[in-house]
Regions:
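Flexible, surface-exposed loop/linker segments and immediately adjacent secondary-structure boundaries
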Residues: 84-122, 127
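A generic structural motif
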Residues: 40-42, 63-65, 82-84, 128, ...
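An acidic-aromatic
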Residues: 52-101, 158
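A short, Trp-centered hydrophobic/proline-enriched beta-strand micro-motif
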Residues: 27-47
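Gly/Pro-enriched, hydrophobic low-complexity segments
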Residues: 109-110, 114-182
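Boundary at the C-terminal end of the N-terminal hydrophobic targeting segment
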Residues: 15-19
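Short, solvent-exposed coil/turn segments at beta-strand boundaries
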Residues: 31, 53-59, 74-78, 120, ...
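Sec-dependent N-terminal signal peptides
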Residues: 4-13
């Protein structure tokens, strides 16, 4: 009988813990209007890093370090990747960032998806939408978004980790203006 009590207690505790994580992540997302952070991105083994600013919904500006002045910008509709020698424009809604940059979408997914604890410190949700699979990671202590993993539009495996996250800062709105073509 005691064995069944412990099993029941463990199941209730685990369910409460999962619900608590979900609620804290959802509340954190609801209270976040923008964030800036450093990032490290691994695309098929090629590592790049830099700094990004996200403004919900669907706006992002990233400057890459040590790379021919590479920037990534979304105004909420289009996504531009620009270097000194190249300029690529994509409809945002055809990229995984369309989902990652939409906090209401993330909130709705977190509500219904099963969480997975990774290494005791990360909370992971796997989102499958429109033939796109994205693993979203949140910090178990702060409940901040701290990364994602997906396959990009070129079928490259992409892992992005965030650090030095700052939320709800005053940001210049013009950083999300799309840059002119080279």
């Amino acid at each position: 009988m005691l064995k069944y009590f412990f099993i029941l207690f463990f199941l209730i505790f685990t369910a409460h813990s999962n619900a608590s994580n979900k609620n804290k992540i959802i509340e954190n997302l609801k209270n976040t209007n923008n964030l800036d952070f450093n990032f490290e991105q691994n695309v098929n083994g090629k590592i790049e890093n830099g700094n990004c600013t996200i403004e919900y919904p669907k706006k992002i500006f990233c400057e890459y370090a040590k790379s021919s002045n590479k920037i990534l910008v979304s105004n909420g509709k289009s996504l531009i990747i620009k270097t000194l020698t190249s300029y690529y424009r994509y409809p945002l809604n055809k990229t995984p960032l369309n989902f990652i940059l939409d906090k209401n979408f993330l909130i709705n997914k977190v509500k219904v998806l099963e969480e997975r604890i990774v290494d005791g410190s990360l909370i992971n949700y796997t989102i499958k939408e429109n033939d796109i699979e994205i693993n979203i990671f949140f910090d178990k202590e702060t409940h901040d978004l701290i990364g994602w993993q997906n396959t990009d539009i070129y079928q490259n495996f992409n892992i992005t980790f965030l650090s030095s996250i700052r939320k709800n800062r005053i940001i210049s709105k013009n950083i999300f203006e799309l840059p002119a073509q080279n």
